[in-house]
From Swiss-Prot:
Coiled coil: none annotated. GO terms for molecular function: structural constituent of ribosome. Its main location: plastid. This is Small ribosomal subunit protein bS16c. It comes from Adiantum capillus-veneris (Maidenhair fern). Keywords: Chloroplast, Plastid, Ribonucleoprotein, Ribosomal protein. It is found in: Plastid, Chloroplast. Belongs to the bacterial ribosomal protein bS16 family. GO terms for cellular component: chloroplast; ribonucleoprotein complex; ribosome. HAMAP family: Ribosomal_bS16.
Length: 78
């Protein structure tokens, strides 16, 4: 099963990339597609809405953390 989940970047000042990745692989595992950049310190997000909608249409599941990030970015998923 493929999921959208955050992948950590940086050591001291953490930022995250929201990636499509196999659910059983490690957090640093092979990425299928990167769809978002999220910086929690600045509350900054960069979305690739077309990629997100196509992935969700193909059956990709969202983790709870990613749903919360999308809500904060005022992006609704049906």
């Amino acid at each position: 099963m493929v999921k959208l989940r955050p992948k950590q970047c940086g050591r001291k000042q953490r930022t995250y990339r929201i990636v499509a990745i196999e659910s059983q692989s490690r957090q640093e595992g092979k990425v299928i597609k990167e769809v978002e950049f999220y910086n929690p310190r600045r509350e900054e997000t960069q979305l690739d809405i077309l990629a997100i909608t196509t992935l969700c249409g193909s059956g990709v599941k969202l983790t709870e953390t990613v749903c919360n990030i999308f809500r904060r970015a005022t992006f609704k998923i049906t």
